[in-house]
Design a protein with these regions (language model features):
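Low-complexity, acidic Ser/Thr/Pro-rich "mucin-like" tracts of secreted and single-pass surface proteins
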Residues: 1-201
Length: 201
């Protein structure tokens, strides 16, 4: 079918030799019009990884999935963190399931009006996940959370030019926005996820 990947194995056999099986990956269609770079957030119902029973794109607060209820469902309006210095849910960061390797990636914080107020990371050459380690609690998002977590964590502050220091943001609605591009292509994909600063709940 046009616009889809084809995966399988090519098997070479002979009368007086070992059988050799090789993995084959092909794509038929327009490469740049194919699937997204970043998997859709888990709560949208459109996540590719979720259909395979794996966790995927979301927001973490500290060491837990933010906004997740007892049934394991993520409720977007409940995604929040509390940067109050108690070492519990003090930071928020995006968890990303990559469907394809990215040429560039930028992670930003937006205010309630969807205006960028801080850039957490801007980097290049982000590889697609090549394997899933079910023994690792980080699962499919190991690549980003392990190697880049320190860069994409948001502690609830923004830079204040007048004082030259980072200052705490007010409670309320914010967003984590991730923009990625493909190698050799000018188009980009942006995934934006809500996150609240809540110091009173």
């Amino acid at each position: 079918e046009y616009g889809h990947f084809v995966e399988g194995f090519a098997t070479l056999t002979g009368d007086d030799c070992e059988t050799l099986s090789l993995p084959v990956l092909g794509f038929y269609g327009d490469w740049f019009a194919a699937e997204n770079i970043i998997d859709a957030p888990m709560y949208t119902g459109e996540s590719v990884y979720m259909t395979q029973g794996m966790l995927s794109t979301s927001v973490a607060a500290g060491d837990i999935f933010a906004g997740m209820n007892e049934a394991g469902e993520t409720i977007p309006e409940y995604i929040s963190f509390s940067p109050n210095g108690d070492l519990e849910m003090d930071t928020a960061f995006p968890i990303l399931g990559l469907l394809r390797s990215a040429e560039t990636m930028t992670v930003e914080v937006l205010n309630g009006n969807m205006v960028p107020i801080r850039t957490l990371m801007s980097t290049t050459q982000i590889p697609k996940l090549l394997a899933v380690d079910y023994a690792d609690q980080n699962g499919i998002y190991t690549i980003l959370t392990d190697s880049m977590q320190n860069y994409i964590e948001w502690d609830g502050t923004v830079y204040d030019q007048s004082s030259g220091k980072y200052v705490a943001c007010d409670e309320g609605q914010y967003y984590l926005s991730v923009t990625a591009t493909l190698p050799g292509f000018d188009g980009e994909q942006t995934v934006t996820m809500p996150v609240k600063i809540d110091l009173t709940a």
